Design a protein with these regions (language model features):
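Membrane-embedded alpha-helical bundles that constitute the cytochrome b-like, heme-associated redox core
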Residues: 2-285
């Protein structure tokens, strides 16, 4: 039970209706008349589409490097290079000749853990997959305050959701991988007969930019730059970065989350098309 204050300042008790879910209206009285379900449905379809493609791409274990056609393009799903399949580009990050499965499997653990624990993605799949809640002023699906899964709702304080707190640590791995993908973008200027630039080079440059925009706009990065300060004047450099750079990126964090997600898939697909010979990568110079 909580209280509200009237205009006169007198407290007014507010009871809890057993037919209401946490924070939402009665199940039979959803007052929203707009198409509130479009956003969670679109997010659901978008994430399912990416997961389906990423699963295929990670398990195909082939044609992830276009060195066979004179292009130094390495799929971001398979970067850094862990096998001899991409040694012609001059760098191998580990002798994984003993690894019989797709090298994308151990690689994707790190960026996947970063995105799964991301504040924006958490909101997205909580709403679109778990319907918890599906939208503002819309009740959770399948339970009330007294019955069903939500009756014992504990937020992110118990296992497994307490593991979402690793996000602040996975950010450091995300920075490393952003650096690796930047290296790949630079390497994409190398051709078998010298320095040049192809359409794939441009795709990898955009990929690195979007990854950095998403990573540096992360809430954990924003806290790292501006958190723990009693006054900003004591750390003017951190305050400048926090206010003029990280916060600006954070304001568009949702946009960069989606753009970087699908551009990674696009970069992988383009590399696969070039490596298989399905298309010719046009060279600008």
């Amino acid at each position: 039970v909580t209280t509200l204050n009237t205009a006169s300042g007198a407290p007014v008790p507010v009871g809890i209706d057993k037919n209401k879910v946490r924070g939402g209206p009665p199940r039979s009285e959803i007052t929203r008349t707009d198409r509130w379900w479009i956003q969670p449905l679109a997010i659901f379809l978008g994430l399912v589409a990416f997961m389906a493609y990423a699963t295929w791409a990670a398990l195909r274990n082939g044609h992830f490097y276009a060195g066979n056609v004179g292009r130094d393009y390495l799929s971001p799903f398979y970067s850094p290079c862990l096998t001899n399949s991409c040694t012609t580009n001059g760098y191998v990050w580990g002798g994984w000749s003993w690894w019989r499965l797709s090298p994308a499997i151990p690689i994707l653990i790190f960026p996947l853990s970063f995105r799964l624990s991301c504040y924006y993605y958490r909101k997205s799949y909580y709403r679109s997959f778990w319907l918890s809640p599906p939208a503002c002023a819309v009740p959770d699906a399948g339970s009330t305050r007294e019955t069903g899964p939500r009756a014992k709702y504990s937020g992110e304080t118990k296992f497994p959701l307490i593991m979402q707190n690793i996000h602040r640590y996975t950010w450091y791995f995300a920075v490393i991988f952003a650096g690796i993908l930047t290296f790949d973008a630079i390497a994409a200027f190398r051709f078998h007969n010298g320095i040049g630039m192809g359409l794939g080079t441009l795709i990898f440059i955009v990929n690195a930019i979007l990854i950095w925009a998403y990573t540096l706009g992360c809430h954990s990065c924003r806290h790292l730059c501006g958190g723990g300060l009693r006054k900003f004047s004591s750390a003017p450099t951190r305050h400048f970065i926090w206010k003029n750079f990280v916060t600006k990126l954070n304001e568009h964090h949702q946009l960069f989350a989606w753009l970087s997600l699908f551009w990674i898939a696009f970069a992988d697909f383009y590399t696969w098309l070039v490596a298989t010979g399905a298309i010719h990568d046009p060279r600008f110079f």
